[in-house]
């Protein structure tokens, strides 16, 4: 990297999953709008055609007159080629296909177990982790060999398991996980504050929060705007609007069809006194099944949705068609801020600015005092030149710890199961997951695990002997 007049050039970013038809385009547009950084993006993907298409799309963006951040995009034929000389590594992959995810999400429904997302917790999240961990073992070993000093940014779910695997394989890695769910909750607070305080256009970044939890089961125990404590305002809003909830307009591609009225957040606040800081669809999967996911009628009553894999397949088809239009020049990507912070964090790690944002990293410094040091936790951190300094978030209330610990323990079980090919550990994790617990007999759980492993065996190591 070269520095001159407050700018940095010759930055190399390796993008693992560089054929992405969602996050990659968001990444490209944010880079194109940042005038103080430039360099090379090396795109690696097992689908080389998809990576090649993104190379074309990225370079078309670079050639545009309205692009201020100039980057050269190239396709790498191997992970080694992409990683060699990289200053930053971005990981954004789909572990398996939506056919495997169809089994993840819908196979447990035969036992009355419903999942609103199926990529983090619950049977679907754990099965996805078993596919993902071997991939991340390979990626971590490659980073260790070819770019050990690079900063590694993960966007892949299940976030906690991905980051945990990177550190398990390469303890000295400089890796962290980025997730936008906290931003979404800040936007809810922004909207409520604008209504209740009669203020126009509050900037989300002016909503200051203390973040603590694990990914997709994250909480605020502090929220303020220009010295105003937002907790009493949030509490009063819930008292007045619990039944109708809060609706917002969200143009982010990743959230557009995931709308909810945030009534699950409101319900959790009434019980625990903290602001739950993730989408309702994610939050529900960390709670006992009967509370929010008992059946489709209960889901409808709480005003969120079950994201079906059929919808995901249709969405992928739409994005494939969009990719063809972008490559041909029939359509052009709009250059507008995505609301994501990945590029801002890279800019901070380059030393051009200083940023506080939420991050998923090991709890090594006990930034959440009463969670294990081996857990991957989500808290705020300070990003500056070649450094991430986690902010001490304090203690999590014990009643929230009790909800969180089964998932942290399951991370340990699933990690060990993935590395030792131990089916009994998968069964153990399923049995204590709150979506599964009390919903099935041991024999039914064992059969479910057997069938789900069989459905995903194409992406599992042969040592599973399936």
Swiss-Prot record:
Coiled coil: none annotated. It holds the Pfam family Glyco_hydro_4C. Disulfide bonds: none annotated. It catalyses: [(1->4)-alpha-D-galacturonosyl](n) + H2O = alpha-D-galacturonate + [(1->4)-alpha-D-galacturonosyl](n-1). GO terms for biological process: carbohydrate metabolic process. NAD(+) binds at residues 11-78. Its EC number is 3.2.1.67. It is an enzyme of class 3 (hydrolase). Its cofactor is NAD(+); Mn(2+). Binds 1 Mn(2+) ion per subunit. Keywords: Carbohydrate metabolism, Glycosidase, Hydrolase, Manganese, Metal-binding, NAD. Substrate binds at residue 157. The keyword ATP-binding does not apply. It comes from the Bacteria. Mn(2+) binds at residues 179, 216. One of its GO terms (molecular function) is galacturan 1,4-alpha-galacturonidase activity. The active site is at 180 (proton donor). Homotetramer. Belongs to the glycosyl hydrolase 4 family. Alpha-galacturonidase able to catalyze the hydrolysis of the chromogenic substrate p-nitrophenyl-alpha-D-galacturonic acid (pNPalphaGalUA). It is probable that alpha-1,4-di-galacturonate (GalUA(2)) is the naturally occurring substrate. This is Alpha-galacturonidase. It comes from Lachnoclostridium phytofermentans (strain ATCC 700394 / DSM 18823 / ISDg).
């Amino acid at each position: 990297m070269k520095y001159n007049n407050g700018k940095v050039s010759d930055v190399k970013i390796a993008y693992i999953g560089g054929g992405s038809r969602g996050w990659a385009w968001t990444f490209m547009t944010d880079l194109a709008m940042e005038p103080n950084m430039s360099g090379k993006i090396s795109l690696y993907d097992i689908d080389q055609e998809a990576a090649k298409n993104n190379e074309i799309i990225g370079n078309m963006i670079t050639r545009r007159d309205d692009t201020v951040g100039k980057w050269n995009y190239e396709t790498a034929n191997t992970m080694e080629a992409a990683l060699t000389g990289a200053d930053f590594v971005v990981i954004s992959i789909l572990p398996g296909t939506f056919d495997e995810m169809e089994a993840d999400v819908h196979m447990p429904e035969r036992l009355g177990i419903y999942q609103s997302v199926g990529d983090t917790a619950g049977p679907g999240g754990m099965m996805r982790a078993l596919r993902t961990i071997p991939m991340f073992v390979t990626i971590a070993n490659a980073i260790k060999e070819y770019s050990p000093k690079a900063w590694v940014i993960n966007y892949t779910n299940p976030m906690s398991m991905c980051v945990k695997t990177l550190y398990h394989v390469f303890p000295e890695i400089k890796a962290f996980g980025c997730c936008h769910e906290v931003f979404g909750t800040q936007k809810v607070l922004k909207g409520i504050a604008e209504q209740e305080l009669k203020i126009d256009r509050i900037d989300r970044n002016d909503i200051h929060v203390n973040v603590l939890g694990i990914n997709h089961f994250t909480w605020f125990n502090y929220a303020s705007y220009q010295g105003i404590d937002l907790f009493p305002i949030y509490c009063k809003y819930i008292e007045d609007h619990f039944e109708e909830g809060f609706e917002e307009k969200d143009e982010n591609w990743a959230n557009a069809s995931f709308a909810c009225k945030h009534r699950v957040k409101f319900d959790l606040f009434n019980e625990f006194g903290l602001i739950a800081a993730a989408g309702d669809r994610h939050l529900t999967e960390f709670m006992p099944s009967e509370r929010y996911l008992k059946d489709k009628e209960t889901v409808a009553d709480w005003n969120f949705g079950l994201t079906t894999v059929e919808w995901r397949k249709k969405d992928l088809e739409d994005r494939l068609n969009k990719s063809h239009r972008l490559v041909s020049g029939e359509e052009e990507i709009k250059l507008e801020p995505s609301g994501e912070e990945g590029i801002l964090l890279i800019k901070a790690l380059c030393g051009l600015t200083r940023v506080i944002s939420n991050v998923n990293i090991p709890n090594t410094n006990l930034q959440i005092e009463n969670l294990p040091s081996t857990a991957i936790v989500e808290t705020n951190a300070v990003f500056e030149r070649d450094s991430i300094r986690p902010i001490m978030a304090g203690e999590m209330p014990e009643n929230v710890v009790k909800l969180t610990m089964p998932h942290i323990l399951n991370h340990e079980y699933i990690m060990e199961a993935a590395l030792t090919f131990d089916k009994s550990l998968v069964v153990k994790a399923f049995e204590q997951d709150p979506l599964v617990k009390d919903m099935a007999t041991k024999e039914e759980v064992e059969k479910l695990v057997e069938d789900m492993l069989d459905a995903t065996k194409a992406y599992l190591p042969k040592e599973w002997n399936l």
